[in-house]
UniProtKB/Swiss-Prot annotation:
Alphabetized GO MF terms: actin filament binding; alpha-tubulin binding; ATP binding; beta-tubulin binding; calcium channel activity; calmodulin binding; identical protein binding; lipid binding
ANK repeat spans: 237-266, 284-313, 369-398
Residues glycosylated per entry: 651
Organism: Mus musculus
Chief location of this protein within or outside the cell: membrane
Official protein name in the record: Transient receptor potential cation channel subfamily V member 4
Gene: Trpv4
CDD domains given in the database record: TRPV4
Amino acid sequence: MADPGDGPRAAPGEVAEPPGDESGTSGGEAFPLSSLANLFEGEEGSSSLSPVDASRPAGPGDGRPNLRMKFQGAFRKGVPNPIDLLESTLYESSVVPGPKKAPMDSLFDYGTYRHHPSDNKRWRRKVVEKQPQSPKAPAPQPPPILKVFNRPILFDIVSRGSTADLDGLLSFLLTHKKRLTDEEFREPSTGKTCLPKALLNLSNGRNDTIPVLLDIAERTGNMREFINSPFRDIYYRGQTSLHIAIERRCKHYVELLVAQGADVHAQARGRFFQPKDEGGYFYFGELPLSLAACTNQPHIVNYLTENPHKKADMRRQDSRGNTVLHALVAIADNTRENTKFVTKMYDLLLLKCSRLFPDSNLETVLNNDGLSPLMMAAKTGKIGVFQHIIRREVTDEDTRHLSRKFKDWAYGPVYSSLYDLSSLDTCGEEVSVLEILVYNSKIENRHEMLAVEPINELLRDKWRKFGAVSFYINVVSYLCAMVIFTLTAYYQPLEGTPPYPYRTTVDYLRLAGEVITLFTGVLFFFTSIKDLFTKKCPGVNSLFVDGSFQLLYFIYSVLVVVSAALYLAGIEAYLAVMVFALVLGWMNALYFTRGLKLTGTYSIMIQKILFKDLFRFLLVYLLFMIGYASALVTLLNPCTNMKVCDEDQSNCTVPTYPACRDSETFSAFLLDLFKLTIGMGDLEMLSSAKYPVVFILLLVTYIILTFVLLLNMLIALMGETVGQVSKESKHIWKLQWATTILDIERSFPVFLRKAFRSGEMVTVGKSSDGTPDRRWCFRVDEVNWSHWNQNLGIINEDPGKSEIYQYYGFSHTVGRLRRDRWSSVVPRVVELNKNSSADEVVVPLDNLGNPNCDGHQQGYAPKWRTDDAPL
């Protein structure tokens, strides 16, 4: 007998309808455990099936053993309503491929399932007996329904930005003691959590689920871990939500993340964030501050460096040792728009660092390669940034120590500028920018960078001080050495074996010539090794083009030393080695044609034709010769050992090439083919061919391909090379001329380098600590007819050179220097045109002259000495 307080029991022949169905059963009734127990009645025996169940065909959802296992698991896990477990199994269906997300959204496609409560509802029905309901029993309250969340559901919700679907997420996490950073909520391929997913799916710069996710993370106690959770795959390793917010240009989310404890020094080191030459796509310096700077977001840069929560340290370096200034140089591409924003951002960061860290100069920090931002710009050929750095002029007195260009005096359109030579010309103490420009052949536009002031005038000054005299002394010395070598080789004895005796005056003169030749060979050997190693040629192309003469001098010295060793050993083969050294020595005299523009351009043409056009021609021609020689020799009749005699049997000989084919025929035939190419050969071998027609046909095709085709192609290519060199002869010769100057300077000892150093020591202002700012500067007198005394921070109010000089240490032994007037003349900032747009930066890339203070190109000569002026 049933207890009146029990819930209603269904009769065996009735069907229990689920809540919310059209049966009219109240949706507020609880699911009776007795009905759940009756669901599995008669499962082991088929005799208890009702007629309704027996007549209904079995469907795919009637797997009773699986259903029993799911409900038993529900009881073990403590699910309040087992029907919820049935609904949760709907998310385990096959995943529909979603649209691709790139970049950084996902490396792989994952499925997205959107569940609608009215779709695909399936209810298990059980026939139970009808029992009258007790009108006195109150309906029990249903237990709360707990939503189930997993990665596909959560990622789909945040992608749509639906905050309503996140209801119940906090309860689910707290009930099951889970966190949003658990592995089950991460993308397996990248380790991405739902926060980066939400930031990558913004609508009009917003995603309303982001504050909700941060609130949930705070309540679950892992806010910092959730915000700073990085990507873990090799492609995007190290990237955090802060990087994504900056890349999406969302300052409000950047502020929100930083306020919640985001790491402002997180480093994104994945393959995607490497330079292009290393297989990456966008290198920005790994740090969030560098990313904001490289994407031209000054408002985010200001916030990261000045926020009250955690300030980004601008002095921080990435895994390559690069600062944010290095990163800006790395992304420069010499276009006008790119150069404009890079230079403005560069100055913003440099000035900001000076104000925040007065004792630090961000521009002097070296990376792992030992390069400052200026050196990096020179090495990578970023001419726009390079020109901006070396010509930077700051008129603000508080940050004037960051200037590299100072106006000493101005009078009308004429003004004298002082350029800071630190890092530009280091006088051998460390690697200088000038050496990087001259000896780094990977820069295609280095001849343009050498035309930027003050580099151009600095080279002219070096040539006037020591380059010209040293160069002509070297020319005379080398020619004398080669004349002595030639006379020594010409008057070698014809009889006897080496070493030859020295008896007469001529013999002693020959001995003196041999000693001088050996001495020059040893000298060239060590100097060539020094030049080849100290220049650090970056590749084979640099070695054979820029270092071609150093390589030829090295080979010449080796031949001279080997020839001397063979001579002393008594081997007559020394003569063969000596003649090669003699030829190569006279060819090396072309090196000294660099001193003159006319002959210097000619030597450059010869180098390019030898290493470019002629090399390719010889490669193809050699293949043709080997192929045709192999085929034609095969057609010749082999030689026999039978002797061929005259009619009187007096002269008997064994037949050889060209009468037949023997062991030496192939090499001799190669020489005959070369003679045919230049029109000097004959066809004596035709008589010994097995098939003369085939032989002649092959010879005709060979002559057409080599004499007609290849030779004319070589002539055309050489003409094109000569034309290209002629168009850029001036710039190319200047590069060779600069190389000659630096070669001479590097051959000097350190004390001579300092003695001939260009520039003067001047006091240009005050440093950050208030002490006099003394620098080694180079003076360039310039003229500007478009703007007159605009925004010029001048040092001296009296124009022209002073007649009073001071001496500073070692410099007084070289020459008198310009008087330091800082103690008597207070620097003034003359601002006569406050409406000039000083912020506009326009870098002329075609004609690299001196821009005026507004950045516009001048129509007149930017300096006193023009490029066409004689040296």
